[in-house]
Amino acid sequence: MTMTRRRRGQIGEAAAAALLADSGYRILERNYRCPLGEIDIVAAQGEEIVFIEVRTRSSQTFGTPQESVDGRKRLRLRRLAAYYLGSRGLAGRSCRFDVVAVWLDRQERVAGVEVIKGAF
């Protein structure tokens, strides 16, 4: 991953976490890593655990951010969520998957953020 891409991802994740916190989500983990991979943000909203994939884009050349979460990525996130819940003694807890789409302008400043609740 190039430095520009990594930086873009960090900007997007920071913007997403700030918006989520302002919207009543309680951030539990950022960049949760386990043997199966990584979840960008794990949060709670009420009694529900929310697994959040952050997608940051500066153009629509390759589609919208939410369109980039394909079937393969969804399956991986479901497996990661099951692992997370099991490792935290939360198996059976209600959960959902949100996608946060972050748009950057040409100067890599946040131009927009959208939360897609229950994206899959």
Swiss-Prot record:
GO molecular-function terms, A-Z: nucleic acid binding
Domain of life per record: Bacteria
InterPro entries given in the database record: Restrct_endonuc-II-like, tRNA_endonuc-like_dom_sf, UPF0102_YraN-like
Disulfides per UniProt: none
Gene3D superfamilies: 3.40.1350.10
Pfam families xrefs: UPF0102
HAMAP family according to UniProt: UPF0102
Family: Belongs to the UPF0102 family.
Protein name: UPF0102 protein Moth_0988
